[in-house]
Structure formats: structure tokens, C-alpha cells
Amino acid sequence: MSSSPSPFGQNEWLVEEMYRKFREDPSSVDPSWHEFLVDYNPEPTTDSSASENGQQTRTAAPKAPPEPAPAPAPKTPDSKTPDSKSQAPKQDSKPQESKPQAKAKPAESKSSTKPADAKSEKSGKSGTNGAAKPAAQPADDSDQNQVLRGAAAAVAKNMSASLDVPTATSVRAIPAKLMIDNRVVINNHLKRTRGGKISFTHLIGYAIVAAVKKFPNMNRHFAEVDGKPNAVTPAHTNLGLAIDLQGKDGNRQLVVAAIKKADTMRFGQFIAAYEDIVRRARDGKLTAEDFSGVTISLTNPGTIGTVHSVPRLMRGQGAIIGVGAMEYPAEFQGASEERIADLGIGKLITLTSTYDHRIIQGAESGDFLRTVHQLLLSDDFFDEIFRELGIPYEPVRWRTDNPDSIEDKNARVIELIAAYRNRGHLMADIDPLRLDSNRFRSHPDLDVLTHGLTLWDLDREFKVNGFAGAERKKLRDVLAVLRDAYCRHIGVEYTHILEPEQQQWLQERIEGKHEKPTVAQQKYILSRLNAAEAFETFLQTKYVGQKRFSLEGAETVIPAMDAVIDQCAEHALDEVVIGMPHRGRLNVLANIVGKPYSQIFSEFEGNLNPSQAHGSGDVKYHLGSSGTYLQMFGDNDITVSLTANPSHLEAVDPVMEGLVRAKQDLLDKGDTEDGYTVVPLMLHGDAAFAGQGVVAETLNLALLRGYRTGGTIHLIVNNQIGFTTSPAAAKSSEYCTDVAKMIGAPIFHVNGDDPEAAVWVSRLAVDFRQKFKKDVVIDLLCYRRRGHNEGDDPSMTQPSMYDVIDTKRGVRKSYTEALIGRGDISMKEAEDALRDYQGQLEQVFNEVRELEKHEIEPSESVEADQQIPAKLATAVDKSLLARIGDAHLAVPEGFTVHPRVKPVLEKRREMAYEGKVDWAFAELLALGTMISEGKLVRLSGQDTRRGTFTQRHSVVIDRKTGKEFTPLQLLATDSDGNPTGGKFLVYDSPLSEFAAVGFEYGYSVGNPDAMVLWEAQFGDFINGAQSIIDEFISSGEAKWGQLSDVVLLLPHGHEGQGPDHTSGRIERFLQLWAEGSMTIALPSTPANYFHLLRRHSLDGIQRPLIVFTPKSMLRNKAAVSDIRDFTEQKFRSVLEEPTYTDGDGDRNKVTRILLTSGKIYYELVARKNKESRDDVAIVRIEQLAPLPKRRLAETLDKYPNVEEKFWVQEEPANQGAWPTFGLTLPEMLPDHFTGIKRISRRAMSAPSSGSSKVHAVEQQEILDEAFAP
């Protein structure tokens, strides 16, 4: 037969105690024990020695002797002793199997020194007859005997049994410093994240399990099988933990519970199993299974200060490992901390390996301890642990102390501080997905080893020159500040900023102590997350498959935006204007701007807003809105508006900036501490921020005098993917935000799974903006729960990423668990808040569903919404023209006008009185009259102040001092010196079209009463702003009801300067024109240009004006206007030759009409006059769109004998006005234009020839054909 020890070892006493309780009251024992205890047959708790083969023999309780006497010691049975059943006393006729032996009392040793039991004597059960005599009281100095029962008896029995195990013990002292320092890192991380702690025993226990894999013999135990010695090798390592428990009676008890299959566990699993065993032991919830099968034990007497112990080894185990106290060597225990740190003395911990010498040899035990030693000092061991716990930083490394002087190391510490300030963000834990979980966030510059420092320097003090408010600090404390400031859930880039004051301001706040949000603030953050997630979940459930470009995975955006706006309200600012792409837009509209849910749900139902009945309208995730934000923890409020945007990513950026600048100029608080009270809050996508050039163009405007808005808060929703493009394919830089360094903006990279960090950064960003009036960038790293849209499957292109995302808990859940874990809120409070919000959505949804459904009809044109007045007077008094002329010579005293500019100014005064007004002065006259009428006029563009063609000189520069004089600004006061309210703002723009045009469009939206003009250097370059033209200027009114009256001045004309200095692309604007969306004009006289601008200023409608302006005509002496053309006329959309309107020309002689526009008119007139062609009349169409049908028909009707009509243009056949006019003229006026023919250059892919000689030949051919017989 085989022999084996009890499976419970030293835990057998506990099993018997459980059995006793079970017999008395089964409900008092955990149900997990019931199955085991039903047929449990315990041994009596008498002492017995082991047999020679190690098997303990069961012995019956002896009968009590007839007279009081010490109980004889039981005889040790030999191998032939009958089993306990044959030796049981026959005091009960019932079968012994039905009554467990544990209920029978074992015989007790009687002693004269033990007082008699009063209860026993009274009942007559003392063993004597008659009255009981009082027992004599023992003397104070007499010995007392106490029968060991229960646990104590079991321990005694087990200890006696352990004497049969021949043991030996190996001892090894192990440096504990690395464990200490890495445990600090681990527990600090856990404290900041999910909570919990790692103990030294966790680390040592895991190292023991790892070492057993290398030395499996340490896991074996000895047993005799069929009388033969055997070494039993268990299938797994079951690590027994010695757990000290305090009973209800105050006595301490020791149990050993097993972590089963510990060898198959990773560190995280091991810790979970370890904590589960300890927790259940303390709660009395251990089961029989937990006590059985221990193969190797770990005991830690060091917790009570024991340095070195040799524990007893129980049968069934091969070894027990003892852990001693963690102490400095005895000879240094009286030394000061400073002395110990200077000497590089670390604490030691003593491990003992007590093993069964029958199957384990001393060398093997020694090697085993050496392996544990090596593991606890190895890089790989702690790397594994850090990865398992999700700690993104490298562990502390075991290295030899560097003997360099403290002075040398002081300099290295200063270098280390600088390195963290510069590159700490590279080590920050900012990626919520941690896609490369095996890679630590590290950089050589941030490694203490790189700086010649080691773990031995951690407790040494160094001079830190005021760092964190101290002159001297321990390196450990320095690193704590640096890592908390730069390497947690916020990574900061600010050392690229050139201004020391700004760096210092940020540094103080980043490295300073951060106040934890109050419980009320945490609950508010949670409510914002609830709202963000519930809104998306609701739409996903109710409108399955509909595109909405959800915010799921980036819900922290909502509390972050909320914090920005709240902080702006705290600063008592006037408004926050939001610009953003389509992702998350509906969520922002609902939870930030406050757009009614009913309106959003109606759009999902397909119900059109009555205000958008005209025009094309747009998809719901492009629309804008406005509302009022009320502070949750303050008394202020602030206006919040969201600008409409197209799907062209980042195209809205300059538009929003222009809109904000317009609002600021209306408030007119200036560039002061109290100025810039309208705050731009711009949301971006990561791929777009790095990829779209307009981002850099818009950033470049940030600090320019004519464009600055006092700082934009940029919030990048960094979902680490662009549709299907990975970051590696989307940018060449480390971060998508690197482009923002060009303007010295501080950049904060924030882990989107930490809403408290996002809120802290958002508030800091507003404070920085208010202090320094500069942009701030917040890079919120998150993820996209679904595909680019709700119908997309992103796992086709990013399978690994979406494997992580599909199993990832949302930020609301993780944040809720953190609050509950800290006891800030209860689970019920969290769920109630979420259900309340969901209930609100459900109620509104049901109301919308019940609304009457209207039949969808085709939308109507927006053209009828704004009609140009037919008889608008634009003429001005001659005295006003004279005043504008005088202003050009009213230079300040001592001002030196450039000698080439002075004649221009003098000529202008002359023109104001005598006429022959040229184009440039006619423009200034128009603007000057507007300023005198109280209009704000803003003119900008490349080289605009002087003019590309040296024609404007709107600002005169002092030749000696560089000071400026702006003549038209004098019109801001009337002749009596009273302010008119007008302003003239003229700026040279940066070399940009996209951002510059977008800015001016936005400005015109933000200030509808302003006259906003942008001039291209050459009209050809307007295609750099094509997205703004297509998405905003031509269609903003139709799509969003967004009104603008921006003016684009585009120099245009074929003059032999090549393909890129010829055309403003008339054909493109005419193709885009519809529904009266723009006014497109090509005026040919200075006076008509004057009236065109004034009409646009006075007509009361808000639509863009596109003017194709001249180049060579600027100095054409024929292209001038008389004073009466300004004082008596108005804009004329169709012009005849002066010979027919002001002279004696005979219309009856005309048989051929040449219709044209622009400067070629002057070439046609010159040719006609040269050839005296009275049969040819030239009619100019000055307004190309809307086409002046009535005026054109009236003009043509004046020529009764016309036989042929030609459209003459210098542009190629496929460009200019002809592609539109060739179709629309015969359709609109069939009686007048059926059969009209074209005279032009041939169709060309480029606007013109690159050769001036070829140009001249082509131009001559046009004229020849126009006047051919």
C-alpha cells in the first residue's frame, strides 16, 4: 500500500474546527465546505509519533483511569498495530462510523496543580461519590498545565511530525534596494490609476515561482509508496502562503493556503490569485481545496522583525522559503540617512531555504537562492512585471554605484532636469490604447544612467538651484517632481518657446502641485461623460446605420471643451466661437452649444428646419448653432457659437479666425489686457492637422497685426487614425502637432482616458491664452470606437488596433469605477445619473416621433431672399471728393514723403478737383466716402497697401523714419472734427491665399456692416483659395444660410505676362454662380468701379462681390472718368460707347455689335476709331452675374439694323465668360442672341501663351476677326 501525508498538513486543525462547527450548525460554515465535510472522518487530536516509514498511525482515545493520576504516555504502535476502529473504547453501542471521533473527548492528564472543575464536581462527574470537596487553590508560584486543543494541538502534532523530515537550511542575504525603489514606482503608478499595492512578498513569491522553473527539484517531496522511498514531482507548483490570522478570542493562528498552478501564471494573474487567497483567509472563506496540495511554502517572519529563521518543513513539501526582515547591515544601523546614502549602503533581506535533505541537496538549494537573488536584481524580471501591470516606464536598474564626486553629479542632475523639461513628453503615458504594450516610454536623455547616475544616488541630496521651490533635493524627490510634471498622463512641449517669461510661467504651473478636483467637480466631469456617451449610444440605437461621425472613444472631448468655456466665463470674456470638423459635431451641438435635442432628432427624421427651406441645405453634421453657457460652479455666463463647416477638413480654420476678429473689432477693446474677449476654440483631427496646409497658413496668421485674435485654443481629437491611414503614413514628425511650434505655442499631449487631466490642461490653456494672448494646442489622444462613419469596418485595415478597441472599456466606465473605488460616489449615484440623462433623450425622441410628418418638397432658390435695389443712389457730393483729395496732402508735420510717392499724392488732389480720375484713385474715393459715412472698411491682400502695380499707396511711409500715414483715416472724422464711426483698416497679408481669403470671408460673416475687401497679387493665384470659394463664398448662403458680402479683387487681363499672370478665372466663378449667390463684375471705367463698390456697401444685402480688376488699364489714359461720373451717375451694368450716349454717334448705321468686357474694350475702340467703322458698335457687359437681362435687351433694342452679333474676349474659347454666355445668352434672350458667335483665342489648357510675341499675334488676330469685313 502507498503512504502519504495528510493533504492539509499544518492546516488540519482548521479543517477539524470547520467540521466541529458544521456538526453543530451547518449554516455557520461557508457552503463551499459542505460537500467535503459531509463525509469527513477526522483523526483524534492526540499526540502520536510517526511510524518508521513516516506514516502517522491513528490511536483511539484511552479510557480515563479509575483514580486521578497523570495519564500515561501512549505506546507508540508498530507497523502491525490494528487500525483505530479495533482500538476504540466500547462505551457506545452505536456504530462508530455514525459519530465522528472528534466528538469524543480524549483522556485528560490530571494534576493536583489544576483546580477542579466546579461544574463537573456538582454534577457528580468528577469520578468520586458524595459531596464534592472544594479544591485547594494553587499557590501563586505553582506551575499550571493546560491541555492543548484545536489549533494548538494540531500545531503540536504537526511539529512533532515534522521531526521525521530530515531538513537542512541554506541562507542568503539579498540586496533589497532595487525591490524598494521599483516597488515605489509600481505603487505610485497604481495609486494614480486603478489603486492597490504590491508588497515585497508579492515580488519575492513570484521570483520563487520563477526560480522553481529552473530548479524543479525544489518543488518535489518525499513519500514511501509500497514501502519504497519515492521522490514525488507534482504536475505544478502550488505555492503555499503562510497567513497569520487573529481569531475572535485574540489568539493568533497560522494557516497555509495554496496558490494553485502558480507556475502557469503571469505576474498579474499571480497577484490576483495571491490577493484572493489572503482576502478569503481573512474573511473565513477559504475552502478545503485551498489547503490541500501545497508543494513549496513561503513564510515571512520578517514582518515582525525577524532577520533569519529556520521554519519547520511539513511532510508533503520539498522546501519552505523564509523571508527575513529588511534591514541595513547591523554595523550601519546607527548611521544617519545622509551617511548611509553617501556610502551607498542599502538594506538587505535574508532568505532561507529549508529543504528535505532526502531529495534536495545543499548545492541545489544554494543555486536556487542564488537564482532568486539574480531575478530580484535583473532587468528582465522587473521588465516583465512592469509590462504586466501596464506601467509604461522603464524600471529602476541595478547598477554599481558611480564613484564620481558629488560636484560632478550636481551638474548631471541639472542636466537631467533640463532633459525632462525638453523631452519628458516622450516618456509620458499619453496613449490610451498602448498598442505597443511591450515598449516602455523612454528616451536616453531621460535615463539617469545616461547622466552617470544610478539608484544609489536616489537618496543623495543635490543642489537644484530653486527647482520646485528648493535649493537642495534628493534625486528621488527630483525625479518624482519631474515624472509627475512631464511623464504621467500629460506630456508638455514648451521649451521651443523663445520668450523666457512664458516658459517660466508654464514651468511653475506644470512642476507645481496640482490640486485634485473636488468631489463635486468630479461628479460634474462624470455627468459630462455620461452625456457624451449616452448621446452617442442613443443615436446608435435609434438611428442604426445613419452617418453621424460619432465621438465614441473620444468622449473626454466634452468635459475638456466644457472646461475651456467655463474658464473663459471665469475670466468674464464675451464669447467662445467654436470651429470643428464633422466628427463629434452633433455631440458638441447637443452637450456644449445646447442645441435642442428635438431639433437634432428632427434632422435625423428628415424634417427640414423652416429657416432652411430655401437653398440646398446641408447634412446635419455640418450645421452651426449658438447658445449661452452657464457656469456650474460660478455666477458667470458666456455666449457660445459653433460655425458651420464643410467636409473639407480644416477649411473652416481661417474662416473662424476671421469671424472672431470681426467680433473683436466690433467690441473695440483693442490689443490690451482687457482685449480679445472673443475666444476661438478650434477642434481638429490628428491626420488633418498634420496633413492640411491651411493649418500652417492659419497658424501663421496668429501673431500678425491684421489677423491676430489674442490666441486660439486648439483641441486636437487625436484618434490615431485618418479614415484608414495610420499615423506612420500620415506624418513625418513625432507628433501631429509639431507644425504649431512655428508660432511658439505650448503643446499639451493628454491621455484621453484621463478626463481630470484633460480638464486641468483645458483650464491652464485658457489662463495662458489670457496672460500672453497666444495660441495653445491640446493634443487629446483617444481612439475611434467605430469606423470613419457608422457603416465602415475599420478592422479591414487596422485589425490589431481594433482588436484592442473592441475589448476596451469606455472612459465613462473607467472613470466611474475610479470614483467609486475612491469612495467619491456610489454605484447607485452613477447609474441614476446615467439613467436620468437617457430618460431625457428618450422623452424628446418620442416627442419628435409624434410630430406631424411633412411631405418633402424640392428646395427653393435663395435668390429671392435678397434682391439688389433697382434705384440705389451711389453718387456723392463733389465736396466730399475734394476732401478726400485734400487728405492725401495733409501729411503730418515733419513727415518726409518718398520723392516717387509725392507726385502721386499731388496728382490725386488735382484729380479730386479737376477730373480725369484714374482707377486707383476712384477706388480710394469709394472707400473714403464709406469711411466718412461711418463704415468700417477693411482692405487686405498681398502687397495691398502699396499695390502690386505701385498704384494704390493707401499707406504712405516716411522716407526717413519709417512712420506711417494713412490719408483715408482722416475721413473717420467729419469736417468739424467729430468722429464718424468709420475706420480704415488696411493690411499686407502673408503670402497666402487659402487662409487669407478664408479669414476675410469669416470677417465679413462676423461683421455684416463692414466693407471687407481682399485683393489677389494676381488674379491667377486665387485658385490657391479654391476650397474657400467653392465651400463658403459661392454656397455658404445656400447650405447654411450664412451670409457674407466679402469683396474679392482679382487683377485680370491678357498682357503677355505668361499663363500665371493673366487670368482671374472668370469661367470658374461663372460656373459656380447660381441663385444669385454672388455678384461678378468686370468694370471698365474708374467711375463704374466706384459705383459698384458703393452699391455693394449700401444695398443692404449680404452676398459676395467678385471684381476682376485691371493691370495695364491702371495707367491707360483713356481709362479715366470725369468728376460728374462720380457725382451724377450710378453703377451701370451695361455700357455703350460714349459716342452713342454722350456724342453724335448714329445707332442706325450699326450692323454689327461686339459684346465684350474688360480692358479689350479699349483695344476694340482704338481699332474702330482707326478704321472709322461706324457700322460696328461695342457694348460692354460690366456685370457678368447676375446677368442684366433687361438692361442688355433694352440696349440692343436701340440698334435696329443689327445683322450680326459677336462675343469678343481675349481669353481662350474654353475660358472667360464664353462657356457660360454661349449657353445662357440664347436661352435667356433668344430674340437677341440666337446665332451669336464667338471671337477669341482657341481653346487652351493654360490661360495664355508663355511668349509675349505669340500673345501679340493672338491679340491681333482677335481684333482682325472682330473688324473683318
Swiss-Prot record:
It holds the Pfam family OxoGdeHyase_C. The keyword Metal-binding applies. Its cofactor is Mg(2+); thiamine diphosphate. Mg(2+) binds at D686, N719, I721. The active site is at H357 (proton acceptor). Pathway: Carbohydrate metabolism; tricarboxylic acid cycle; succinate from 2-oxoglutarate (transferase route): step 1/2; Carbohydrate metabolism; tricarboxylic acid cycle; succinyl-CoA from 2-oxoglutarate (dehydrogenase route): step 1/1. One of its GO terms (biological process) is tricarboxylic acid cycle. Belongs to the 2-oxoacid dehydrogenase family. Kgd subfamily. Homodimer. The 2-oxoglutarate dehydrogenase (ODH) complex contains multiple copies of three enzymatic components: 2-oxoglutarate dehydrogenase (E1), dihydrolipoamide succinyltransferase (E2) and lipoamide dehydrogenase (E3). This is Multifunctional 2-oxoglutarate metabolism enzyme.
